[in-house]
C-alpha cells in the first residue's frame, strides 16, 4: 500500500526567535500529527518538504498523482506581494496555475504568508495593513461560513502579521474577521482553506512572536495582546482539524 504524502511548501528560513519550538515546518508537522490522531486517521502519512524559498518546487505533474493528499504552505517573514524576489513571483505563478486549472490537484492549506500568497496568486490585493501589526492570541469573529466550518461563534488563534488581504478572491469565501483584519481566512469547498493566523503556534510561541514585534505596537496595544496570550484559550488545534477534513475532501 502506497503511503500518502503531504507536500509542505516551506517559505522561510529557520528563525532564531522560534528556535525553542523548531522551525515552521517542525511546528506544522507536529500540528498535523496531533490533529491526524484527533481525526482518527490511522494510515501513515509522509511529509515531503519543498524549500521553495531556495527555489525548490514540486513538479505540477507529480502533484496530480493520487499519492498526494494535500499541500500545506507555511508562514514567512517575506512579503507575498513582493515583485523582485524570484521565488515569491514563481510561487504566485505556480499557485495560479494549480488553483485555476481544470486539472485536479490536491487541496491546499495556507498559513499566514500562505493565506496571503494564495490570495495574491488569484488576483487579490495584498499589502501592509493600515491598521498595523496584529499579534499574540487574537479573538476571531466567525461569519456564517466560519460557523458552519468550525462549529463555533468565535475562534482564538495565534497571529503575527503586519500584512493583510484587502479583498476576497473570486469563487472563495471569507470565514472570519478580527478587530484589525477583515479577511482572516478563505475557503473553497474541497480545494482551499487558509488562515491569516497560525494554528500551529501555541500561546508561548505567539507571545514570543509578539515580543519580537513589540516596536510595532503602542504600549497599550502590546499590554492588551500580552494579556490575551495568557487569558484566551488557544483554539489552534481545534481549528486545524479542518485542514485534515479539507485534505480528505470532507469540507
Swiss-Prot record:
GO cellular component: cytoplasm; cytosol; nuclear periphery; nucleus
GO molecular function: transferase activity
EC number(s) on file: 2.4.2.-
Pfam families registered for this protein in UniProt: GATase
Keyword Cytoplasm: yes
Keyword list, A-Z: Cytoplasm, Glutamine amidotransferase, Transferase
Database matches in InterPro entries: ChyE-like (IPR044992), Class_I_gatase-like (IPR029062), GATASE (IPR017926)
Up-regulation conditions: Induced upon copper deprivation.
The keyword Cytoplasm appears for this protein: yes
Cellular location(s): Cytoplasm
Active site positions, chain numbering: 112, 198, 200
Domain Glutamine amidotransferase type-1: start-end pairs: 48-232
Chief localization: cytoplasm
GO biological process terms held by the UniProt record: intracellular monoatomic cation homeostasis
Other facts: Present with 1510 molecules/cell in log phase SD medium.
Biological function: May have a role in copper and iron homeostasis.
Protein name (database record): Putative glutamine amidotransferase YLR126C
